[in-house]
């Protein structure tokens, strides 16, 4: 028994346990099995930290991630005409067709609202059609530009302003695309805006 306990002490501090339906898990005294139904991902940490936004943590360092850690969206412009949505001078680039919206955190106004603190990935592809004026597209975080992309080749019928970034966001932070310079008179059909939660913090 003594050697067995010494062997257990050598187990790494981080363990992943995946239980299958009906699989018995034995108690520490090996007397009676504990039957767990369904699937459960358990992360053991020798130095646990309390997370009040989506994870529960015990003194033993066992943390179970909440379901709202799954966040993703992708939207596209499905028509090629100048819409009235941009006439309000906000210059927010509007996407009329939402392809993916896991968690429903991408609004009908084409603004993503972060549900929790974490690292998020964003990318965009805004097409300029049939006009020679250069456009500048900014990815905005709470009203401030973070990154930009440009499209301005006069000899190309269709050109795209494209960029991507990883961002640290707090809960309720807002991310959207803004047309900083130029216009989209010819429309921006097939333009896309996508994002997802890489991991929560």
UniProtKB/Swiss-Prot annotation:
Record's SMART domains? C1Q
GO CC aspect terms: collagen-containing extracellular matrix; extracellular region; extracellular space; GABA-ergic synapse; glutamatergic synapse; synapse; synaptic cleft
Q: Which residues are glycosylated?
A: 29, 88
Q: Which domain of life is it from?
A: Eukaryota
Domain C1q: where?
66-201
Residues annotated as signal peptide: 1-27
Write out the annotated subcellular location.
Answer: Secreted; Synapse
What Gene3D superfamilies does the record tag this protein with?
Answer: 2.60.120.40
Question: What InterPro entries does UniProt report for this protein, alphabetically?
Answer: C1q_dom (IPR001073), Cerebellin_Synaptic_Org (IPR050822), Tumour_necrosis_fac-like_dom (IPR008983)
Q: Which UniProt keywords apply?
A: Disulfide bond, Glycoprotein, Secreted, Sialic acid, Signal, Synapse
Chief place where the protein resides: secreted
Gene Ontology BP annotations: inhibitory synapse assembly; protein secretion; trans-synaptic signaling, modulating synaptic transmission
Question: What's the PTM story here?
Answer: Sialoglycoprotein.
What this chain does, per the entry, is described as: Acts as a synaptic organizer in specific subsets of neurons in the brain. Essential for the formation and maintenance of inhibitory GABAergic synapses. Promotes the development of dendrite-targeting inhibitory GABAergic synapses made by somatostatin-positive interneurons. May contribute to the function of ventral medial habenula region of the brain implicated in the regulation of anxiety-related behaviors. May play a role in CBLN3 export from the endoplasmic reticulum and secretion.
State the oligomer form and interacting partners: Homohexamer; disulfide-linked homotrimers. The trimers are assembled via the globular C1q domains. The trimers associate via N-terminal cysteine residues to form disulfide-linked hexamers. May form oligomers with CBLN1, CBLN2 and CBLN3 prior to secretion. Strongly interacts with DCC in a NTN1-displaceable fashion. Weakly binds to NRXN1 and NRXN2 long and short isoforms produced by alternative promoter usage. Interaction with NRXN3 short isoform is hardly detectable; no interaction at all with NRXN3 long isoform.
Name of the protein described by the UniProt record? Cerebellin-4
Supply the source organism's classification. Answer: Eukaryota, Metazoa, Chordata, Craniata, Vertebrata
């Amino acid at each position: 028994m003594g050697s067995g306990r010494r062997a257990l002490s050598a187990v790494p501090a981080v363990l992943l346990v995946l239980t299958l339906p009906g699989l018995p898990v034995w108690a520490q005294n090996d007397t009676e099995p504990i039957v767990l139904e369904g699937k459960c991902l358990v992360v053991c940490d020798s130095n646990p930290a309390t997370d009040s936004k989506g994870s529960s943590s015990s003194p033993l360092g066992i943390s179970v991630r909440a379901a709202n850690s799954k966040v993703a969206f992708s939207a596209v412009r499905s028509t090629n005409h100048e819409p009235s949505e941009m006439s309000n001078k906000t210059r927010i680039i509007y996407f009329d067709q939402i392809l993916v919206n896991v968690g429903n955190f991408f609004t009908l106004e084409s603004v993503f609202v972060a549900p929790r603190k974490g690292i998020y990935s964003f990318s965009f592809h805004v097409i300029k059609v049939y006009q020679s004026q250069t456009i500048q597209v900014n990815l905005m975080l709470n009203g401030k530009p973070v990154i930009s992309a440009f499209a301005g080749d006069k000899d190309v019928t269709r050109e795209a302003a494209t960029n991507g970034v990883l961002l640290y966001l707090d809960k309720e932070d807002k991310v959207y695309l803004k047309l900083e310079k130029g216009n989209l008179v010819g429309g921006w059909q097939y333009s896309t805006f996508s994002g997802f939660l890489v991991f929560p913090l």
